[in-house]
């Protein structure tokens, strides 16, 4: 039985070694993960797609897909989550004492933008960012209806331990 096992192990190692192609001149060199020999020799730069625009909310999946072409999408059990998005509001925030910002996210729903374009001359992006989708309107309507039904934001239920710890 042991002889058959050793024979099987030897054949497996031999066939695995024969399956690897011989590489002249690279016998002792290791390559980094994900690099092929052609890329190392040609020194091809990594392909980078610039961000077209920046979304004001990551809940707007259509906007995230349109604007952030180079993000990595991770599938989680609950939902698909965007990974690698930058802080989009940092450059748009003004000082509190400077007065109202013309394109503030707190303006009326008719003038609210869904994203900010990177290029000033990109008319397609400007059109996309200026229009609110029906999905966003439905989400806002549902939130307003919930607020109206409950009389405000959801209240935390008190437990028996809350009653005991009151002063």
From Swiss-Prot:
It is found in: Secreted. The gene is Edn3. Residues 97-109 have a biased composition (Low complexity). Disulfide bonds join 53-67, 55-63. Residues 140-149 have a biased composition (Basic and acidic residues). The keyword Secreted applies. Transmembrane segments: none annotated. InterPro entries: Endothelin, Endothelin_toxin_CS, Endothln-like_toxin. GO terms for biological process: axon extension; axon guidance; cell population proliferation; cell surface receptor signaling pathway; establishment of localization in cell; intracellular calcium ion homeostasis; intracellular magnesium ion homeostasis; melanocyte differentiation. This is Endothelin-3. Residues 22-45, 85-112, 140-167 are annotated as: Disordered. The record marks 73-74 as: Cleavage. It comes from Rattus norvegicus. The lineage of its organism: Eukaryota, Metazoa, Chordata, Craniata, Vertebrata.
């Amino acid at each position: 039985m042991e002889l058959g096992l050793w024979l099987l192990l030897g054949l497996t190692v031999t066939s695995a070694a024969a399956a690897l192609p011989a590489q002249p001149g690279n016998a002792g060199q290791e390559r980094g993960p994900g690099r092929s020999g052609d890329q190392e020799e040609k020194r091809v730069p990594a392909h980078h797609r610039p961000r077209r625009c920046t979304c004001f909310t990551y809940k707007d999946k259509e906007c995230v897909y349109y604007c952030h072409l180079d993000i990595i999408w991770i599938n989680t059990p609950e939902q698909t989550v965007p990974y690698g998005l930058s802080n989009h509001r940092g450059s748009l925030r003004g000082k509190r004492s400077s007065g109202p910002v013309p394109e503030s996210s707190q303006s009326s729903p008719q003038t609210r933008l869904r994203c900010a374009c990177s290029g000033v001359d990109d008319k397609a992006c400007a059109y996309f960012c200026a229009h609110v989708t029906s999905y966003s309107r439905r989400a806002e309507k549902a939130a307003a209806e919930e607020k109206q039904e409950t009389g405000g934001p959801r209240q935390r239920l008190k437990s028996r331990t809350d009653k005991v710890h009151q002063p």
